[in-house]
């Protein structure tokens, strides 16, 4: 049996107001091609199909079209669970219709194992699928005290109990897979992930996975990575696109699992190539260097985070020219190389209103604060000194 594991599509997500939907369409086309080329029997989507609980209509349309194509219109099984970004009720609302087309949609946590006959391999697949299990979605209060360590221990115990219940339904004559959307201790995070719980209270130990699972398919972390210290192969497939500049330089992929009953799986990573990469530029030679890079066509198809060394603030005209020359600039961040001189000014007898005016000019690209604003600032400073 060949299983493709993907996760964290985040359909509808934007990058500083820029739509990523065309890129998401392209990478879904690529995943569909991989499924067909690699003769995949089952597709698993481990949560965060959408970026918000109320996704735009175009994102929902793309999602259901993708499921239809991945299932080959009912010939291949596809299983989807809700992540922390998904609305569990909304995701599972279409489950009765989807089930008739070999698509399983699970929104709320459950300990019931899904039994699936896979005609293409003539084998049975048992999926212990656990959608994102928050306290509210579990409909349980795990700890009344505001004790993070206690909540973390209780949460891990609860997830372990759910997986243990699933383990009872796993069979030796079937392929046994667990799937969930959660944070496992030790995972490498990045900026585009919304924390599951502040402080890390919703953290699960790899020892909590069902003992008889041959593979654990995970979602939530956007960097593809194996889970350390698990008793069986467990992996985050990662997001198919880079969604923050903290992911710059990281490859994106889907995971393919070749597995038979009672046998250890063979895990392989299939790299993805679609979508615009996220790239960081550091221009230490100022604007001239940036103009040269643009003329050379450097990273022409990328989204770019630009940090540029300057002695004076960039004018609005200079900023507009950069964006006109290349629409891929997401951030343009001036780095003032005379910052040390500014710091020294603070230690001298330069009037506070002069320092404020300089700061305002740097922050606004050359703008001048009004006299009313300067007086308000001085008033606030005086009040702070009185305290």
How does the language model describe each region?
Residues 1-68, 75, 375, 379-383, ...:
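N-terminal active-site segment of His-dependent metallophosphoesterases
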Residues 184-186, 190-258, 263:
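Conserved beta-sheet core of the metallophosphoesterase superfamily
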Residues 14-16, 49-66, 82-101, 107, ...:
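Metal-dependent catalytic neighborhoods of phosphoester/phosphodiester hydrolases
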Residues 37, 42, 259-387:
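Accessory, non-catalytic peripheral segments of nucleic-acid enzymes
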Residues 93-200:
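Conserved catalytic scaffold of divalent metal-dependent phosphoesterases
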Residues 8, 28, 48, 63, ...:
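Divalent metal-coordination and catalytic microenvironments
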Residues 6-7, 43-48, 77-84, 104-109, ...:
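Active-site neighborhood of phospho(di)ester-bond hydrolases with catalytic His/Asp-centered motifs
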Residues 10, 40-58, 75-89, 184-200:
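Active-site neighborhood of divalent metal-dependent phosphoester/pyrophosphate hydrolases
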